[in-house]
């Protein structure tokens, strides 16, 4: 069993809307098991990872429901036309930055794929958990329509 004890952390109680100082937060196998006032004489099992958090505020991970982890450029044509390996390499610092800002889960709304999600899940790279939608859907002529503008009067070229 993987047990973590955050000792004496500040924790926001969302029911009372109070920031409670000196709380011990017990986590087992990735799940919060209890939040109790700090008890200096409490038994701590061997192998427990104890993190002294006095003066620090503990909060759950943030979730962003609309990201594009491969959007390293604001120019969508540059982003869409770059080789996949470049898109991946440019996504790595973006993903790590998301994690360092507290986002532990993101929904990629177009661009990032299952492979990037799997790379973070298996700790191959640092980043948030990614729920990838795959390719973006867009209306004709919208920002996701990668076709160039055309002034052709007969778009299909089939009339004589």
Q: Where are the predicted features?
A:
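Metal-coordinating catalytic core of metallo-dependent amide/deamination hydrolases
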Residues: 124-160
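Histidine-rich, glycine-flanked metal-binding segment
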Residues: 2, 11, 15-59
């Amino acid at each position: 069993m993987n047990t973590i004890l955050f000792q004496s952390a500040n924790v926001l109680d969302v029911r009372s809307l109070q920031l409670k100082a000196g709380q011990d937060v017990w986590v087992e196998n990735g799940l919060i098991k209890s939040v109790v006032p700090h008890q200096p004489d409490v038994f701590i099992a061997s192998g427990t990872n104890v993190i002294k958090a006095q003066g620090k505020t503990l909060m759950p991970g943030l979730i962003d429901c609309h990201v594009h982890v491969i959007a390293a450029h604001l120019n969508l044509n540059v982003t869409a036309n770059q080789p996949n390996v470049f898109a991946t390499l440019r996504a790595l610092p973006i993903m790590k930055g998301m994690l360092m800002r507290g986002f532990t889960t993101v929904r990629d709304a177009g661009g990032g794929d299952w492979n990037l999600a799997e790379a973070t899940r298996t700790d191959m790279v640092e980043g948030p958990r990614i729920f990838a939608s795959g390719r973006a859907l867009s209306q004709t002529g919208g920002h996701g329509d990668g076709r160039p503008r055309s002034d052709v009067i007969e778009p299909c070229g089939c009339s004589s």
